[in-house]
Structures are given as structure tokens and as C-alpha cells.
Amino acid sequence: MSKEKFERTKPHVNVGTIGHVDHGKTTLTAAICTTLAKVYGGEAKDFASIDNAPEERERGITIATSHVEYDTPSRHYAHVDCPGHADYVKNMITGAAQMDGGILVVAATDGPMPQTREHILLGRQVGIPYIIVFMNKCDMVDDEELLELVEMEVRELLSEYDFPGDDLPVIQGSALGALNGEEQWEAKIVELAEALDTYIPEPERAVDQPFLMPIEDVFSIQGRGTVVTGRIERGILTVGDEVAIVGIKDTTTTTCTGVEMFRKLLDEGRAGENVGALLRGTKRDEVERGQVLAKPGSITPHTKFESEVYVLSKEEGGRHTPFFKGYRPQFYFRTTDVTGDISLPEGVEMVMPGDNIQMVVELIAPIAMDEGLRFAIREGGRTVGAGVVAKIFE
């Protein structure tokens, strides 16, 4: 057992396999674990244990996902693999498994198929920043020209969705060959691991990003002023910092004159901590739940955006009937509901429970948002959908 396994000092990167059904995503996941365990040490995982993915509930949505881990000399990877297409759709939209990069698996025997395209589109919509291609089953194709053709098709398809199709790494391999211990194919898995190490940049840690805290509660403390509480999502809040209050109303700025946690006064609060922030000269009725406290200029409020939405099925506790244009549910962002109008893509009349759909949403009040922000769709407090902001309009 190599000592490396227990050192958590290496950078941690989240990846996952995406691509068409039966193109070998799970076989590749097993091949990566097995080959890298052999080469660098770590724990091998077989196909059956990965394929038998447990169901998880993320915001009431049932998703089957397998989580595996593996190491390269310079990094520790957490990798997600889903058994079914619907699981991928839900996973990507809810952000249940955030990916710093995706491994797109395309069988050389088939080339790009409908779900290949759909996963690339979803990756673009939900903001997967980097994609590496693993062309699988290359041991089944004798014709070198055919391999080149498939590679070209995949690159063109990625470019169509604004990924750098000409420049991203494409590895031609055989997951099954590697799993069976054939050296030429194991070498391709190592090549894939090297591509992960070099092509996907180390993700910026939450604590290094600009400060943001969704406001959950507001108190006024006699003689001290107004305190807002919440969990810091990213960055650091230091006493004396200027902060903006963004969303719902016009943006205002003020100074944080105190940070407290568990009734103790601190100099700062960091990402992941639940804190109270004392705001200078702010009145109790000028701030409300649903707004965010943020580094000035780092985030802006918006009302209109394009989103990718998964509509819960009846079995997941969602609607029993479809909805049509003119539907006006609540959109739950971070800590609060805001009513919004939707418009459906051209030619789409209705949306059935269990569908995923692109829709443009116009909220009745602005919310602090960036592309990639997740939200829930609710009717009277019951979740009926999950979505992600794909593109901001105004």
C-alpha cells in the first residue's frame, strides 16, 4: 500500500465521464482506477462495483451515481460516473457532482451519437469548463483513416458548442484492453491521466474567490446596529471590509464592522463558516433574506436569463401533469423564492414531468447571479424542478 494514499496535501480535482450509452463510460472508469492503482498505487475498482451505483437524493431528485477516487503523482481525483442517461442529465443540472472537467467517451466503432451531442450541450449549459475526449474501443477498428474521421467529427461537434475542439486532448484507446492488462492500452490510460493533470487547471479554492454570503436572517441589536447571518459561500470577510448588499432591491454598499461566530467576535469569517456580520449604518428594514453580501462589483443582480431545467417526475414528488407557456412558479435562489415567467423554446408547447428543457425565465425581482448558479422551481413550497443559469440576458 503506497504511503501517498493518505496524504491529503495534493490538489483535489473533480472529474466525471460523460457520453452516449454503451460507449464505455463505466468500463473506462474501472480502467482508470485499475491502471493508475497499478502504476501509481491506490485502490483498484472493478466494473461491477462501479456499475452498481447507489441512488442518492439531491434536493428530492433521485440520481444514481458512482463515486470513485484515484491518484496521479501530482493530484487526487474524485470521479463520478452515472449508469443511465437520465442520471447524467439530473446530475449535471442539479450540480450534485460539480465537475472541474469532463471526460467525453466516444466509441470509435460508432462515432458521435445523439447523447454525445446532448451531453456536450449540457456541459456547455451547466458550465463544465474543460473536456478531454477518450475515443474508446479503438482495438475494434483496424482502419487508421476511420479513427481519424471519428476524431475529426468529435472535434467539430465540440467546436459547435464553443469548446476548443481543435486544441483539446483526444486520446485513442481501449478501456477493456486496459482492464484486461494489455500494455499498449494501459499506456493510453496513463496518457489520459497525464492529460487530466496538464489540461484541467487546478480549481480555485472557494476561500480564494471574491467574498459572497447569502443572507439568511437579519437582526437588529440594540446599540450595535444590524446583523445579517448566513454561511459564507466563497472568499473571506474581514472586519473593516466594504461590502455590497445585492439583489431584490437596489444595490447598496456599507462597511462590515464586526464578524461573529458562536457569539464570539472574530477578525474574519471564511468560506464554509456560518457567521453574523455587523453592518455599519444599515437599518433592519433595508436588508432581507434572499439578498447577498458580496465584495463590491463582484456580482450583479439580474431578472432575465436562459436556463437548463430538469422537471421532477411524479415519482420524485414532482407535478403529475405537464405545464404550458404562461406557467408562473417560484424560483428558489439560495435562500428565497422569487416568482418568474417562463418562455419555452420554439415549437415546444408543453413540458412533461421527467423532461429536461431550456427555458428563458424573467423574474419579478432581481437576484444576485452568475452563470452556473443553481436554483429550484417550487409551487407553494414544494420542489417541482431544478435548474441552472446558463446565460444572463438582463
UniProtKB/Swiss-Prot annotation:
Which segments of the protein form a coiled coil according to its record?
Answer: none
Q: Where is this region: G3?
A: 81-84
The name on file for this protein is Elongation factor Tu
| Region (G5), start-end ranges | 174-176
Q: Where is the tr-type G domain?
A: 10-204
Annotated gene:
tufA
Q: Which organism is it from?
A: Vibrio parahaemolyticus serotype O3:K6 (strain RIMD 2210633)
Query: For this protein, what is any one GO molecular function term?
Result: GTPase activity
Q: Which InterPro entries match?
A: EF-Tu_GTP-bd, EF-Tu_GTPase, EFTu-like_2, EFTU_2, G_TR_CS, P-loop_NTPase, Small_GTP-bd, T_Tr_GTP-bd_dom
Q: Which GO terms describe its cellular component?
A: cytosol
Protein origin, superkingdom? Bacteria
Tell me where in or outside the cell this protein is found: Cytoplasm
